[in-house]
């Protein structure tokens, strides 16, 4: 299934194995959707640019499905959203706060990165979150990238942005456990080396393509990473780590 937010204040749910398309018209007050997730109970969650977190009132999909502002969100905050492999929802905001939600039980846990464990060089408004198979939370901010152990509340590694490595726009893990970061300057492979994070780029140049802003990353069932740019889509083999 693929969820798409449109510029016409609507949602599309696409079944890539068939021809089914579900269209949902959003409430008038919902604009600039930053993330979409459907929980295990069928409810749809939306995060917005500056209108807070919304949850569908019903767990059935139909064109006039209504959404309400989630009671634990701040309407003035900018949020990002990540759904982990266990169905948990992770929300990051522009106030450096992280909120984990079990949508089935309603349990919530707030993570505030403490100064003594977080790296101040990268601590800033949160743009992207990703919980990997090692149960480490990758946090992309306006200043850089941090790997955080949410169980011990420790910063494992961190790296500020550089001239060659700019703002992170997407995060994904392949089937071998390798982390990939989409940025405003192309795709990069990431590896933790002690307290630092090392990046490997240049994948676009393997096919004589110009590195551009990555819009989205998607890993299919064949361990192939699909990378969407503003003007192209390329594929990286998750095993060989090469453009295929």
What are these model-predicted stretches?
Residues 1-244:
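Carboxylate-rich, polar loop motifs that coordinate divalent cations or form catalytic acidic clusters
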